[in-house]
Amino acid sequence: MRYGEMEVKNFNPEEIEVWPNRNDRHYTIKITLPEFSCLCPRSGYPDYATVYIEYVPSSLVVELKAIKLYINSFRDRHVSHEDSANEIYDLLYKKLSPKELYLKMDFNPRGNVHTIIEIDSKKN
């Protein structure tokens, strides 16, 4: 097993690394992760998506390698589009307690179906 595979396999989402936000001003962090993949819980076929995260931090920010490893940890999991989006959103909201959080997952079309899931803290 190569070092990258080991990092992803051993990644514990509950230990996702966060850092103190040293800036008092209101600002938005935008992160795009274009290589999300998981397995369809029904067929086992791979699903691919681009993950868009936007948040206004309060006291914490997420470390970028940690979010990359977390997203990559879905690669061999059988999980629905809806569940993966909500799981990612819930973990980020729990760990960061941001002032605002928006998550969008734009899944590649498969079987003539294109799915986009959006979750917005301003609407919840």
UniProtKB/Swiss-Prot annotation:
Functional pathway: tRNA modification; tRNA-queuosine biosynthesis
GO biological process, one term: tRNA modification
Intracellular or extracellular location(s): Cytoplasm
UniProt keyword terms in alphabetical order: Cytoplasm, NADP, Oxidoreductase, Queuosine biosynthesis
Highest taxon in the source lineage: Bacteria
Entry annotation: catalytic residues: 40 (thioimide intermediate), 47 (proton donor)
Any one Gene Ontology cellular component term annotated for this protein: cytoplasm
Chief place where the protein resides: cytoplasm
Binding site for substrate: 62-64, 81-82
GO molecular function: preQ1 synthase activity
Function: Catalyzes the NADPH-dependent reduction of 7-cyano-7-deazaguanine (preQ0) to 7-aminomethyl-7-deazaguanine (preQ1).
Similarity annotation: Belongs to the GTP cyclohydrolase I family. QueF type 1 subfamily.
Protein name (database record): NADPH-dependent 7-cyano-7-deazaguanine reductase
Gene source species: Wolinella succinogenes (strain ATCC 29543 / DSM 1740 / CCUG 13145 / JCM 31913 / LMG 7466 / NCTC 11488 / FDC 602W)
Gene: queF
